[in-house]
């Protein structure tokens, strides 16, 4: 529904169910699922996938979210759209994998070094998770930035019935690609009527 093309992750409770389901369902729609060797590689993989034009996402929990911070900062600086899901669990360090917590809000805002804005959404039930996941991808593409989705262990492990809209009824923001002639300046922020910015279609990445 959100247009996800690529997922890279590393198993960590209580976010593992996201990876397990996507490993089955994402390839059916032509997407790519990769289990990486660690959390840092997972974040770097979705950055690389996004540079090629794919809508990309990873999912983790507190300790893994800490490891991803340097790469998240790079994605912010380089204006690379992607989505990071943090299914929060209790405690510092390894913590309590099956204990609910909402303690990573400050880290979502100020987890990396330097000063930058970040978009973070949080959901309290699965209907919100569905809607906010779509919104997260749209915001990432619109503002050319990583977007963080914060859930907790309760949301991560519970099951609910959802009201699923028709896919055609969901507005999706797609990336605008352009190309320029050699020797011509590229201006991604030139005003457009739709207020969207373009990305340079580089053969080095695609």
Roles of regions detected by a PLM:
Residues 99-153, 165, 176-181:
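Conserved thiamine diphosphate
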Residues 44-45, 131, 159-160:
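Short, solvent-exposed polar/charged micro-motifs at secondary-structure junctions
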Residues 52, 142, 204-205:
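A very general structural signal that marks isolated residues within well-ordered alpha-helical segments
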Residues 23-25, 73-76, 134-139, 164-167:
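Short, solvent-exposed amphipathic alpha-helical segments in soluble enzyme
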Residues 147-202, 206:
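Conformationally flexible catalytic loops at phosphate/diphosphate-handling active centers
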Residues 9, 48, 138, 144, ...:
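Generic detector of well-ordered secondary structure
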Residues 1-110, 117, 153:
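Thiamine diphosphate
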């Amino acid at each position: 529904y959100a247009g996800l093309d690529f997922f890279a992750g590393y198993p960590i409770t209580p976010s593992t169910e996201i990876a397990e389901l996507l490993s089955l369902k994402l390839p059916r729609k032509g997407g790519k699922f990769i289990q990486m060797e660690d959390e840092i590689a997972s974040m770097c993989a979705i950055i690389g996938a996004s540079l090629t034009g794919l809508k990309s996402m990873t999912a983790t929990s507190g300790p893994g979210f800490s490891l991803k911070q340097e790469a998240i900062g790079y994605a912010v600086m380089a204006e690379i759209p992607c989505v990071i899901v943090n299914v929060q669990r209790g405690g510092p360090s390894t913590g309590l994998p099956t204990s609910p917590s909402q303690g990573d809000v400050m880290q979502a805002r100020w987890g990396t070094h330097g000063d930058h804005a970040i978009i973070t959404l949080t959901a309290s039930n699965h209907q919100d998770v569905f809607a906010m996941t779509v919104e997260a991808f749209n915001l990432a593409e619109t503002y050319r930035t990583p977007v963080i989705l914060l859930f907790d262990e309760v949301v991560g492990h519970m099951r609910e019935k959802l009201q699923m809209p028709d896919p055609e009824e969901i507005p999706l923001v797609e990336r605008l690609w352009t190309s320029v002639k050699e020797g011509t300046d590229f201006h991604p922020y030139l005003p457009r009527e739709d207020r969207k910015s373009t990305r340079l279609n580089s053969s080095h990445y695609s």
